[in-house]
Amino acid sequence: MASEEKTEELHPFTDIFNEDETDRNCLLSKPTCFIIFGKPGAGKTTLARNIAQAWKCIRVEALSVLEEHIAAEKETGAMLQSLLVSGHSIPDELVTKLILEKIKSPEVAHFGYILTEMPSLAQDNMTSLKQIELVKNLELQPDIIINIKCSDYDLCQRTCGQRQHSTTGYVYTREQWDPEIIESRRRKKRDFPKEGKSEEEEEEEEQEEEEAFIAEMQMVAEILQHLVQRPEDYLENVEITVKLYKELLLSALEEVMAEHNPQYLIELDGNKSPEELFMTVIERLKYLNVRRAAVITKLQGTEEEMTDIIDTEELFRTVSSYKLIAPRYRWYRSKWARSCPVSLKDGNIYSGAADYTVSFLGKMYCLSSEETLKLFSLNPRPFLLPPMPLPPCKVFIFGPEHIGKTTLANLIAEHFKAKVIDYAKLVQPRFDSAREKLIKDTITEATNTAIKVVQQRLLNEKQAKQQEERTLKELQVQYSKREYNDFLSKSSEELPSLENTGSKLSSLEIGQEDKSKSETTITGDQVKDVSTEESIEEVTENHPEVFAILEDTLRHAKELNFEQPHDKQAEILEEVIKETEDNKNRFPGAPKHGGWIVENFPLVRELWLSLIEKALLPDLVVYLSDAESNGKHVLNRLYLKNKAEIDGKILERLQEEAQAKKREEEEIRKVKEEELRLEEEKQRLMELATKKSKGRHRLTTLVAHHLALPYPDYPDNEAEEEVEDSEIHEESEAQEIPEYTRGSSLPEASETSETPEGDHEPEAEFKPPGDTAVEAETEKDPKEGLGSEDLLKVMLPEFPEDGYPNVPEMEPLKEVLNNHILSWKQLEQTIMDNVVSTLTVDVSNKTPQELLQRVVETMERPFKYSAWELNAEDYEEEAEDYQAETEIDEEQEEEEEEEEEGEEKIKEKRRHMGDTKHFCPVVLKENFVLQPGNPDEAVKYREKIYYFSSTEAKEKFLEHPEDYVSQNEPLKAPPLRICLLGPHGSGKTVCARKLAENFGIFHIQFDEFLQEKMLLKAERKFGPEFEDDSEEEQLVKQELEELAAQANVKIEEDTTKKQLPDVQLTEEEEAIKLSLTDNEPLPSEILDSILSEWWLKEPIRSTGFILDGFPRHPEEAQFLGERGFFPDAAVIIQVDDQDIFDRLLPAQVQKWKTKQHKKLERKKLIKDLKTKIKEDMVAKRRAELILEREKKRREDGTFRDEDEFSDEDADYEDDIENILEEEFPKDEEEMSEEDEEQEADATERLRNELGEKFETETNNIQSIQDEFDKVLIPIIMVNGARKMHIVQYVMNMKLKPLVENRESIFEKCYPVSSHLAHKMLSYTYKHMSSFGYWDPVKLSEGETIKPVENAENPLNPVIHRHYIYFLSNKQTKEKFMMNPIKYIRQPKPKATMPVRIMIVGPPKSGKTTVAKKLASDYGLRCLSVGDALRGMLNNHPDSELSLMLNWHLHKGKTVPDELAIQALDISLMESVCNTIGVVIDGYPVTPHQMDLLEARSIIPMVIFELHVPSKEIFKRLLLEKKTEQSMSYPLHNSSQIIAYKNAKYHKNINEIRQFYQKQHQNWHVIDGFHSKWWVWNEVLKDIQQMNKYIQTYMKKIKEGKAACIDKLCITPEELIARLGEFKQFCPVSLAESNELIDCSVTSSLEFAAEFRGHYYKMSSQEKLNKFLKDPELYVPPLAPHPLPPDDLLPKRLTLSELKSRFPKCAELQGYCPVTYQDGKQRYEALVPGNIRYALEYRNCIYICESEEKLQKFMRSPMQYWNQKLPRKLPPLKESIHLTSLPLPGYLEQGTATSLIKAMNAAGNLKPKLPFLSVRRSVLLYIAFHLKAFNPKGSEYSRKKYKKKLEQFVERCELITYLSSKMTRKYKEPQFRAIDFDHKLQTFLSLKNIDPVTG
């Protein structure tokens, strides 16, 4: 449809629609960088300081960089400090290095820089050219170049007047310290006239000035004695520095500025004050729409400091009002919420502190520490750019075995590009290895210790043994000696006592000796350790004693563990995580830490505490549970995992039970068999007893013997029966079991495969074990006598497919599951105590993707914008904002208007609504219906308010708000849906049909829709207006049919109607019928089925409709609100009852008349039928009576004469008549007429009916309106009493905004003051739109001049979403606010240059009027040379130029043009001239002035010459003198002066005009004789056209495309200098057809274009369009044909050049080479050339036949140059006079062509003039034709004979016309053709007239 086609053609948004994308674009944008050029002392540093302070960029200067490094007290700073302290200067190389490092710093990467000292005059380390190349190659290249211009004289005077304070180091200018200058400034200010002030105000102002002057003089007196002049400020030093600058840097800097984009080159007048320079730069930056660096603002309140324990909600609510931008514009919450963005970038989720909260891009960010705050403040971009905020992905997954942990972990890892750490596979093996290593080391250490102990013991034993042997030997020797001596000296009696005493002494001595010897031995042993050790045997780990020592150690080695095993496990886990985090290939921008998921982590509390100590806690703990199904799914998976083992145990148990049962059954069987045997034996015995009576005693004895045997304890009979019954029952059940059960038999042990270990998920498709029947063969117990071949059939118990068998074998698994749950509950409390987020997910009936979605949502929820219900605090904030706004807005007119609306409406109007405005977003998304939300059900999301239709809708939005808001484009609005209401007869159907046609939507008439539904079945319409007629017609039809049948008459078909079918209506149809007939409301069920098709089903759903006549009742309106079928608006047509009477009553009366007429006709027809029937019946009865009489006579048998019974017959006739009258009496209708309703009564009755219906409908409409007001449906009232086309127009105008502004139906704009708008931009609270200060509305209307903001034309800022738009006036503001989407869907504004216009013309031509009009409407500077001179003298009186001007003026001389142009050039550097533009009035007027302007490169975009005749000039002068007031001095407006000026102007203007037309093609002549409005429109049209050319050129060049250079003031010299490889030949023609088309024949640039810095000229518009579309195809390297060298290019020769080539002869002996080649080199194609068409190619001369042939050769010389003549040439042609030819030849050479044309025309026309022969007629026609088309005849002659020829043809056509119109019979004049008489008279008048002269 049309709407869809329109959507496809929509232009993309100028500004990014998505707010997050806008912030991302801002973060990715390059910061604005400045560089300032200028002479030393021009003020670069001061200007840089001011710009850096205002623009928030970093000032990169040597001094500031050095001070920063020294203050940092780092290594570089210490080195710099030492150099300075030692008195050395810092090397230039080091300074340059530090500056470059500063430029590459993160701070500069965000804020940008402003550079002033590169390039520098220092050439030792690096030349100026190298410095410039260094600046050009910077990563952040300068965007804005500022050039401060100042003359050498002015700069030297200013610099040498500077003084420095000896203590503070502050530099003062002469204006600040010189008392004389201060005094002169005071005098000038005092002499300045003060207007509009009272005497008291003047006195107060003078007193204040006097006090300020005294204070300033005191300050000067204090500092004057401390001021010194620096050596560099001496005049001679300044002059040397300036000279050095001009020699070394100026030329190179000029080249840099010439290469730079002129739009971003700002030139300043250095004579202005620093404040003026700064304001000029700021205005220029504002005009250029340069992005300002986004500032970071620390949010800290003046109240008590907040603690970190404060709630997050309270924190944000409190901090958002710190440093408030304005009421209602608080700081927003970011995606990071309270998380620290710097820590999050590192992979740690730390909560930010309240004291470290900052604002950036309008949002709040909480930093966690002073260090993170510092990093964020330097450059927040790396921490905020996508993919941030992103959860670091530190996850622990817990859960029972086989619940799906591995699957979920892998899915999470895949989603977050992370790695899974399986604790059992990666950590536990390492821990086991470490433990084994510990055991091994312990055993090794114990072994070494044991070996040393054994070695030491063996050594000690050996030493002791040796010592003992030595001691024993010594004792033996001593003892033998002493014994021998004692034996000799003493007697035998004293021997025992001596022995005892000697033994004691000897033992004492021996002890002392042993002690001394042992000491000696030890000392000796220490000296001889090596020899001793070598002497003992070698001890190894296999030594028995060593093994005995290690036996206990080896016994406890397996139980050996670390002292803190959990710490060791945590340490290993830390190592694994670190290895995982070292993975650099995760994804770009990934956090430093994180990216891991741990599974199978032990549920050990001590291990978790170790993780806390190691700071290894995860961000999220996921626990997978199966609580919902009570572990059913987990047990199912565990069973499947261990199916073979469990099934085996189940089968084993079942087989044992079956065997036990079998054994029991066998025992019972044996007992029964024994009983049967005994019974049989007893029976046999009894039989024997009866047979043998002799042996009774013996039998009794035998029986008694048998009965006395010890029998087993048999069961009683009942028990036996039960056993037998149970056996039979079991056998029957066994027989009922089919042979093939649900499952398959259990495979044999050899075929069973073991299930691999590990936590792997079972496959989704598997056969439940309950469906499996297992048959097992078991051998019967031989003890029980069972055969080995008997088979026992055992089946596994059945269970659900997703369940498990409830058997005792599952109890261990259940126990394991219960133990896991208990362990988790114990660990869960520990986890929660450490504030780690825990997510418990039930896996029941959930897919892995659903589990992943749940986990991802939980992980990402902290980093998404959250929505919350509007609470009391929000309403309090809104009330505070409203109160603050009321206090601020005092004088606003809008405020006065709003006060009339009421406070609630004002609050609603100012409330910042969400992406669906006041409509419910949930209903919009789900039902595509615009349902107004309930303000009580409000939610705040991203600082915007959303209304909802119900609590359920609000809950949906709170759960997933991002699903219901716009993302990259506005939400699509449903089509227009309108309910049109009005009383019957108000014209709503006509209006609805017209509106539907205009808007392209459906028109639905509700009553007609119901009638159509009924017509399908009942084939008739229902309603009061249809019921009466139909019933009456049926009755009449029935009566007519009966009468016709009686009368035997056939009634015409058109008098009757088709018999309606008798149908059975459904309940729905009965309800519709009742609604139509009795005007009852329809039931809700029927309304729902009908309306849902229009609101919810295609094609009406997406097209829209106008619902005519619905709702009809309040109940139906209430149903619309309850069901959610909301129209956009309800249009109610208001009319009075009289209007209804005037419209409907005439038709009703006419209908009544028609009805009455038909009724009378029916009555007449019925009457006639009844009369005919009566007559037939009377005639029949009469015949019967006569027959009776005749019969009676015959019965009497008497015959009488006629005379006899005439009287009797007469009486009998009377009797018959009487009888007929009695039987057929006359109808009462015939006797008396029925009383019929008269017209007046009918009219009154109809009027009353209409009035009652109107009143009823009006009341219903009022009730409906009340219902619509309740559900907030807009009501549009339209006065329907006016003419219908006016009502339609009014209705169309009221509904048109709903259609035209449909795409902006959800958009809301908020106007703000200009001050607030700029404040928001400075804080980067809102973004400047791509339109900058362009008016989007005017831009869409074709405006090319940017509006300017001043006191007279203030801009109107408007906030739309996250951008600020500046509108030029209130009208455009209203347009934009009504449909902002329309105006932001347009191309971005093209780059503009300041408009520079000159207007020249004679005096009184209107130059100044046009110039002032341009200045007032567009803000241009209106400048004349006099204004420039006066501005120079007033603003810079001490400058060199002002001194020179005063020198000339004081001598009474005129200012020389050179000085005037210099003053004009300085004036053109003003801010307005460089931003908006300038219009120069009345300049230049002499060629010299023109040359000076050209030398200064002052080239206007366009020059307007107002051409006014001299007579008009003096006429305007006289009118001006009549109206002007008399002045005290004479004016230069006398007629003589004006005449002199006019003459002087006309004398010089031609030369000036020719110069600009030739050089710049920018001269436009305007006819000034017209009105000033006509002149203004013409000037404006030309300016707009020129602006479009320039803007298009700049846009295409910036995009790297080809652009047309027409009307760009390019001089021929510049064109030649920048021509491309093809010079002035068309590259398109050369590429496509290999033709050389020289475009230098014309100087026009209409078909010229620029591409890659070169100019190319094309031959036509078509070629230009091709080149502009694909320029790469026509220039190298893709160009197919290069341009030949100059010596191979053809050159056209003039006659003089041709003569100069003599005696060189022409090629081909002068024959035309083109004609010869095109003629296929035939003999007839040898045509001599004409010397006027000569050319030179390849140093050869060729002569062509004509200009056309010459151009052919010039285009394709290769085709024609190399030809050879044939041997036979045609003879030379001699000239013959035409008159010497014979007549046929003469005619052939002279008039053949014209004569042939005339004869062909005569042959086609076949003329025949009336009353002339054919021959004479043809001759006359040929003669007239020759005269009319004679090329040598005069224009007058040709026109004359053309008229005669046309008259001749018309007269010839008279014969054809009259022959076709005339008839043989006479026709009266009124029956003839209109022109017949005139043409006939003309025909007859030609009889005697000369056809040539007549």
UniProtKB/Swiss-Prot annotation:
Residues 1108-1128 are annotated as: LID 2. Residues 32-286 are annotated as: Adenylate kinase 1. The keyword ATP-binding applies. InterPro entries: AAA+_ATPase (IPR003593), Adenylat/UMP-CMP_kin (IPR000850), P-loop_NTPase (IPR027417). Keywords: ATP-binding, Cell projection, Cilium, Coiled coil, Cytoplasm, Flagellum, Kinase, Nucleotide metabolism, Nucleotide-binding, Nucleus, Transferase. Residues 61-90 are annotated as: NMP 1. AMP 1 binds at residues 117-120, 230. It catalyses: a ribonucleoside 5'-phosphate + ATP = a ribonucleoside 5'-diphosphate + ADP; AMP + ATP = 2 ADP; GTP + AMP = GDP + ADP; CMP + ATP = CDP + ADP. ATP 3 binds at residues 1404-1409. Residues 1005-1036 are annotated as: NMP 2. AMP 2 binds at residues 1034-1036, 1063-1066. Residues 161-206 are annotated as: LID 1. Disruption phenotype: Mice lacking Ak9 do not display developmental abnormalities and exhibit normal spermatogenesis with normal sperm counts and architecture. However, spermatozoa progressive motility is markedly reduced. Residues 198-211, 715-736, 876-903, 1223-1241 have a biased composition (Acidic residues). AMP 3 binds at residues 1430, 1482-1485, 1489. Residues 188-211, 492-533, 710-789, 876-911, 1223-1243 are annotated as: Disordered. Pfam families: ADK. Highly expressed in the testis. GO terms for molecular function: ATP binding; ATP hydrolysis activity; nucleoside diphosphate kinase activity; nucleoside monophosphate kinase activity. ATP 1 binds at residues 41-46. Residues 1395-1584 are annotated as: Adenylate kinase 3. Its EC number is 2.7.4.4, 2.7.4.6. Residues 757-768, 777-789 have a biased composition (Basic and acidic residues). Broad-specificity nucleoside phosphate kinase involved in cellular nucleotide homeostasis by catalyzing nucleoside-phosphate interconversions. Similar to other adenylate kinases, preferentially catalyzes the phosphorylation of the nucleoside monophosphate AMP with ATP as phosphate donor to produce ADP. In vitro, can also catalyze the phosphorylation of CMP, dAMP and dCMP and use GTP as an alternate phosphate donor. Belongs to the adenylate kinase family. This is Adenylate kinase 9. It comes from Mus musculus (Mouse). The gene is Ak9.
